[in-house]
Amino acid sequence: MKSASRLCFLVRCRPALLRRWVRCACSGPTDADRLTRLVASMPKEPTAAKELRAQRVKAKSAPKPRPSEITLCVLGNGGPGNPRSLYVITDQARYMFNCGEGTQRLAHEHKMKLSKLENIFFTHNAWGNLGGLPGLALTVQDIGVPELRLHGPTDVEQLFDMTRGFMVTDRLTIVKRNPSDGPFSDHCMEVQYVPLFPHVTSEKAFKKGKCDEDGASVVAYICKPHSKPGQLHLGKCVDLGVPPGPLLGELKNGRDVTLPNGTLVRSSDVVSPDEPGPVFIVVEVPSEEYLNSLLENAAFTGHQAAAAREQDAARVVVHFSPPSIMERPAYLDWITRFPASTVHLALNEYAGTLSSAAVHRAQHRLHLLSSSIFPLLHVEEPSGVPKDLRDANVQAAETLTKFRLRPNLGLQKDAVVTLDPAAYVQEAWASPGFSERLQELKAASATKSQDSAAASSYPEIVFLGTASAIPGKDRNVSAVLVNLREDLCILLDCGEGTLNQLVRFYGFPRVNKVLATLGCILVSHLHADHHLGLIALLRARQFALEALGLPKEPVPVAAPRFMVPWTSRCDRSFEPVSHLFTFVDNASLLWDQPSPAEERSDLIRRLKLKDLSSVLVKHCKHAYGFTLTTEAGWKLTYSGDTMPCEDLVQAGTGSDILIHEATMEDDLAEEALLKTHSTTSQAIDVGSRMGARFTLLTHFSQRYAKLPLVSDRFHASVGCAFDHMLVRPSDLPVLPLLFPALKSLFAEHYQEMCDKTAKKLRQKALQHDEKRMPDGLPTAQHASA
């Protein structure tokens, strides 16, 4: 039965992994036996997630009390390179408004529990509001959330149909609620949908006397938390002679009671009045054509200064509208219709770029090892809200700005993200043995730097994402920028949040110049962690060209052919992106073709390269690696995701640098095989067989968030990649020298990994001994007896 349940789980949720396992097992004369053992070894759905999901389903039917605590928290401030997202935190539940790329990563760093998230509200079906939804959905599924309700604009739910080819969310039920369904209400609050329409559409619809609410691409929300029941004052009950027992419950529930002596005690005499729920509004006007719909909508009137009751006036309005709209006189007029006491929070480009302290903390510590390889990241200060908006109580919302609705109504900024470079450096110096290792590194690297002083400054390799599967606070998912020269760069893969990483590394607006020099994007395969950042990057490049006054030429994107249906669906359901790039099928770039295809030759000429080719690797279907050679003869090979692959070895022969995935440590070779990934030693071996002058390891499992386990196979031609690491040819001899200092810098984390590895080895040895033990052999306990 256990094997059957495992098989059912894989058939339902991991069909691709099942096919790979079957191929691994069925390759010899003992296929039946091997397949039997294979099924027995298959993983079941994680027990903890399964139990949590069952508990959550059961808990949904149980009555819940009204929340005593409600806080609005800015998770993504909407500044340059940052997502924009509002998180509503209550005692029993969480609610999210918009989910841009990088939201999941910020939630992880800032310890925002996602296990209680079941409702996400979208203000506009633009990629900037929902680009982080696929990754977040995978995370909440894995932690046992049974159902996710999506609220608002049309077609938002289509995202899950679009991602079905590379993302499995079968254990997560997706429910869409439309404006026509009426207000949403649960134990915490009631949310009224307010659809907004373009001016022309709105005018025609109103003349006809009807409007398709479910067809709206923009929706505002009026949120009213339920009243908090009044408190029972036990002192007053004692004074009135109410005995302990069920009568107290009756009074608490609002019912008058008669005491045994005939005295009538009214509930209102011993229970304080209910506390009304403070109203908050979430709104976005993405462009001028929606402005009239906002101004003319009567739904807001009852929550502005003209509200019939003071408690109905909005206490806070959260604006996702861009600065270009908020600065229009008509929008300012709408803001001033609210009471002067209403707080207005702007989640847009008024904010600064700082949203994560973790990435800066890591970079400040690594900067001590080499200021050129690990340059400090850029932080742009908030641009500031114009005076007329400030006078209307509008302020830029920074990450972790909070507005407390209950209890103690008010704005809180004590938790806003700040940096403390001195503390980060002090942490590094406090690491055992770090000072000694750093001195040794400086002495050794000085000699190496002199030896390589004549090396060229280009190409430059900037690692933007070095993690596999999901982003973490220290490592983002796959992306590598290669600056071929000052005026030309290419991008290898483009995982979620790649644009955010670029802004941190280059700063704003310098990042615009980098985007303008982007000559090509190479996507190795269509797993989520390798391409979900593409749409945001393409849009940012378009804005950069416009800002710099340059021609808006589409950029070539080489990818598997299924990229075209994906972007076409984005065109139809969200926003047009296909005109921003020209598609090149990776199959047309294959290295082993007798004569180069026209697309390959054109791309080589455009990039002024000597050669550029793709190679099929051993991962999922249509997974590719790439090789490129500059006019000067410098050769780079990029593996993408793969297990050791002979074709990659042949295609990359003689490479100056091999960038190879090393998802797992050597002791997880079996797991790496089943998931078609490579271990560190396997990646190093590929580099050796290829004859690569240097091998750079990347794409680490998040279990190695700080530093991968360094095996005996590491040598003078092997380096380990980190996010925001800049590597030039002259830096290559220095990279292997970093390992002793890195192990000291992350000593606690590294020792923890070593202990886990030792524990796994002991368990394997014990299991091996148990299998070899003959039946009936007395145990040690019996023998001693």
Model feature map: region roles:
Residues 1-29:
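N-terminal chloroplast transit peptides
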Residues 114, 124, 129-130, 140-210:
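Conserved, well-structured beta-alpha core segment at the onset of a catalytic domain
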Residues 120, 149-154, 176-178, 318-319, ...:
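Extended hydrophobic secondary-structure segments that form protein cores and membrane-embedded regions
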Residues 725-726:
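Canonical P-loop GTPase G-domain recognition
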